Amino acid sequence: MGIALMFLLALYQMQSAIHSEIIDTPNYAGNSLQDADSEVSPSQDNDLVDALLGNDQTERAELEFRHPISVIGIDYSKNAVVLHFQKHGRKPRYKYDPELEAKRRSVQDNFMHFGKRQAEQLPPEGSYAGSDELEGMAKRAAMDRYGRDPKQDFMRFGRDPKQDFMRFGRDPKQDFMRFGRDPKQDFMRFGRDPKQDFMRFGRTPAEDFMRFGRTPAEDFMRFGRSDNFMRFGRSPHEELRSPKQDFMRFGRPDNFMRFGRSAPQDFVRSGKMDSNFIRFGKSLKPAAPESKPVKSNQGNPGERSPVDKAMTELFKKQELQDQQVKNGAQATTTQDGSVEQDQFFGQ
């Protein structure tokens, strides 16, 4: 059996070699326009031409090649037909099937469908024998989509078609890469209220960024202080203060660097300096003139109290002692000077 098969293959190869021989030197004169009375050009010494033209059918010639022809060209300079063969061609179709070609070129035959049948190959509707439920099950089975709805997108495994691509068991309302979080929350928010800004942990959304336990009315980085930053002991509302209390203004009723005192009415006005400036604990109101003198002084204006007399005596004694010490020091200095003069003249 093997020898017979090899013999048949050898015969087929020889036949193919004979039929696929191409003329190397074509007859240019044979294709040229000549008069009808001219003689026919002599035949060439070619076995293939002799075999083809040996019979009476000179008007028709048929050639068979091993490879299919991909391109047919004409060389007008040589008056020849140029054939380009396709070595790795498709498998020959012995019969053209227009339905198969239409199915192959169908738009519904999408690329990268693995294990699924084409829509054209499905049985027509109404051919299912049974109820509507069985018909739907047969349709899904025929689609061969592994128990999934054909409306799902490509490469979706057991997920709801409403979900976006690459979502595994998550709600489609959630954004991409959100794991078990509320879709109202922003990206990368873990257990926080969606009204809060980014990177806010347990704070109300009314507060500004980086505020810890403070009211939103306070400015940035204010810890338990009033609205007016760096104002100590003053009213927190500038708009509610009187114009007399403008900070860092000199020559106004609100005296700068005054502690516990009220503003005088004539502070640095008309070139007059107030006596209470930079004085601590002094009353602004001057002492009222005494309308009634002391009773002890009304009767005897010349008499003094015993305390005044004692103080006067003490001051007098102190002055006398100081005068005596001063006189003694002057006398000692005079004596020393006279002794030095005597010694100088004695020498």
Curated annotation (Swiss-Prot):
Q: How is it modified after translation?
A: This precursor includes 13 peptides that have FMRF or related sequences at their C-termini, and other putative neuropeptides.
Q: Where are residues bearing Serine amide located in the sequence?
A: 270
Q: Where is this region: Disordered?
A: 283-347
Q: Where is the composition biased (Polar residues)?
A: 321-347
- Give the top-rank taxon of the lineage listed in the UniProt record for this protein: Eukaryota
For the modification Phenylalanine amide, which residues carry it? Answer: 114, 157, 168, 179, 190, 201, 212, 223, 232, 250, 259, 280
Q: Which UniProt keywords apply?
A: Amidation, Cleavage on pair of basic residues, Neuropeptide, Repeat, Secreted, Signal
Regions of compositional bias (Basic and acidic residues) in chain numbering: 305-320
Whether Secreted counts among this entry's keywords is: yes
GO CC terms of this entry: extracellular space
InterPro entries xrefs? FMRFamid-related_peptide-like, FMRFamide-related_np
The cellular location(s) given in this protein's UniProt record come to: Secreted
Pfam families per record? FARP
Which GO biological-process labels does this protein carry? adult locomotory behavior; behavioral defense response; larval locomotory behavior; negative regulation of heart contraction; negative regulation of heart rate; neuropeptide signaling pathway; positive regulation of cytosolic calcium ion concentration; positive regulation of neuromuscular synaptic transmission
Q: Which residues form the propeptide?
A: 23-102, 235-240, 283-347
Gene Ontology molecular function, alphabetical: neuropeptide receptor binding; receptor ligand activity
Q: Where is the signal peptide?
A: 1-22
Modification sites for Tyrosine amide = 146
The family classification in the record reads: Belongs to the FARP (FMRFamide related peptide) family.
Tell me, in a sentence or two, what this protein's role is.
Answer: In insects, FMRFamide and related peptides have modulatory actions at skeletal neuromuscular junctions, and peptides that are immunologically related to FMRFamide are released into the circulation from neurohemal organs.
State what protein this is by name: FMRFamide-related peptides
Q: Which organism is it from?
A: Drosophila melanogaster
**Source lineage:** Eukaryota, Metazoa, Ecdysozoa, Arthropoda, Hexapoda
